[in-house]
């Protein structure tokens, strides 16, 4: 399995590309470099918001190019951010945090199948950019 980022513009790029353009660039790059024998690609979110990462994954899985690999997610921040925001370290918030985590897992499961249509709401925690300048792993 490979664990790359999607092909997205840099954080300071002024151009906003559509999910379909990101999908086409990502799948094209994979087709040029990844042998079909590789069983799957598990994408990192790369600082995208939770919703943006889900929408882009969905677009990748509906891209009209041949995709011989399973294309799914291996998100950290883009799977956990809403849950952590809801939890805030308080035991009383555990149920709300669990609900947020399950919701994001379900959304990303649908996106991995190319069946996610988007929430249409980028105003909540899921719509917040998760970009961290000079992030070190």
Curated annotation (Swiss-Prot):
Active site: 3 (schiff-base intermediate with dihydroxyacetone-p)
Catalysed reaction, written as an equation: beta-D-fructose 1,6-bisphosphate = D-glyceraldehyde 3-phosphate + dihydroxyacetone phosphate
One Pfam family named in its UniProt record: Glycolytic
Site (described: Necessary for preference for fructose 1,6-bisphosphate over fructose 1-phosphate): 137
Gene3D superfamilies named among the record's database cross-references: Aldolase class I
Pathways involved: Carbohydrate degradation; glycolysis; D-glyceraldehyde 3-phosphate and glycerone phosphate from D-glucose: step 4/4
UniProt record similarity statement: Belongs to the class I fructose-bisphosphate aldolase family.
Subunit (UniProt): Homotetramer.
Other notes: In vertebrates, three forms of this ubiquitous glycolytic enzyme are found, aldolase A in muscle, aldolase B in liver and aldolase C in brain.
Protein name: Fructose-bisphosphate aldolase C
Organism, scientific name: Gallus gallus (Chicken)
Gene: ALDOC
């Amino acid at each position: 399995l490979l664990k790359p980022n999607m092909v997205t513009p840099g954080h300071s790029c002024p151009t906003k590309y559509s999910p379909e353009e990101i999908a086409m660039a990502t799948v094209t790059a994979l087709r040029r470099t990844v042998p079909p024998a590789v069983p799957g690609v598990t994408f990192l979110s790369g600082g995208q918001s939770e919703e943006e990462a889900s929408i882009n994954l969905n677009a990748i899985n509906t891209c009209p190019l041949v995709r011989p690999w399973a294309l799914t997610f291996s998100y950290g921040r883009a799977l956990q951010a809403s849950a952590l925001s809801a939890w805030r370290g308080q035991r009383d918030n555990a149920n709300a945090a669990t609900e947020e985590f399950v919701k994001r897992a379900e959304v990303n499961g649908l996106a991995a199948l190319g069946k996610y249509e988007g929430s249409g709401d980028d105003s909540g925690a899921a719509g917040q950019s998760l970009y961290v300048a000079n992030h070190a792993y």
